[in-house]
Amino acid sequence: MNYKIYTDGACSGNPGIGGWGVVIVNKNDKKIYLNGGEKFTTNNQMELTAAIKALKYFNTSKKIILHTDSKYLKDGIEQWIKNWKKNGWKTFTKKPVKNKELWVELDNLIKKHFITWIWVKGHDGILYN
């Protein structure tokens, strides 16, 4: 079964109080809503957390189309992470990767799923974003 997942993260102040949200839609249009937050976090941490919580929802391998308005999340998981791992979790400027623990967790979670990552423009009238 294919699932569509919509994730988002936000922060008031950066860092500051933040939250994340997830909508999971199955082929029968049934929706599952997940959300949470942190007292002291960043926008990027909340974006990563939303994706992590969405993928942790599933106990078995799924085909997923994951929509995010975070280029940080999409580019990080599709492009940057390969080099970060090769470089000992350092950026191309030799600085430590920010949010490494979250990236490692996400990287481990994606291994059991078939995921297509879709970037959507934030606050552009897209349902569930």
Predicted regions and their residues:
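RNase H catalytic domain
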Residues: 10-14, 52-129
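RNase H-like nuclease fold core
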Residues: 1-45, 49, 53-62
